[in-house]
Amino acid sequence: MPLYEFCAENITLLEKAFQAGARRVELCDNLAVGGTTPSYAVIKETVRLAKEYKAKVIVMIRPRGGDFVYSDQELAIMLEDWKVARDLGVDGLAVGVLTADNQLDKDAMLRFIQASQGFELTMHMAFDQIPLEDQASTIEWMKEVGVTRLLTRAGSPETDLKLRLERYKEYAQLADGQLEILAGGGISLENRQLFLYLPGVDQVHGTRVVF
């Protein structure tokens, strides 16, 4: 059965999304910059609402907009934000850390993996900035260390839809059932079935996936 993950930057549309079939929410703030960590009170209220609908809450852990290269100080803040969100009852986090040359920062990611044992960890769309030739090995590494899922648009906003669909198939083959593939980026109620027809892709993400 397909799973619809609603991307929310506040609580305004949450109940509408749950009533329309969303069974997981990625909660963030400031979608204008691609999402940042939401506030304590927003997380708390989202968890309360989600429980009423038996839905899951994944919280975005990102201290600012811009790139995904973080200082030690920023990483410490992100880990502390995760502890707060975890204690508020979320089901997991969405996070992504890159090096200056757009490779996955494995040392930093391992810190989040260790801090989130027993919770779900989504590698978010920072993945899409990793060079194509390095994406397969990155997926292999994520499988090995226990990342729950990969949220990806399989390209950039300019990438042709047909090419994106082909890449999703490749990602799903590489994931081999050991890493969930979550399709996102321009997916709506009207076109979501195009992505859900793909072998190995049974979940979609976005602000318009359920209404």
Task: State where each predicted segment sits.
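N-terminal pre-domain/capping segments
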Residues: 1-25, 30-37
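Hydrophobic faces of well-ordered beta-strands that scaffold small-molecule active sites
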Residues: 2-8, 25-27, 57-61, 93-95, ...
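Catalytic cores of alpha/beta
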Residues: 9-20, 66-84, 121, 128-145, ...
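Active-site-adjacent beta->alpha loops and helix N-cap segments on the catalytic face
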Residues: 11-15, 31-56, 72-75, 97-117, ...
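Glycine-rich phosphate-binding active-site loops on the catalytic face of alpha/beta enzymes
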Residues: 22-35, 84-101, 145-160, 199-211
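Short helix-capping segments at alpha-helix termini
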Residues: 25, 51-55, 89, 116-119, ...
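A short, flexible beta-alpha/helix-coil linker loop
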Residues: 31-32, 64-66
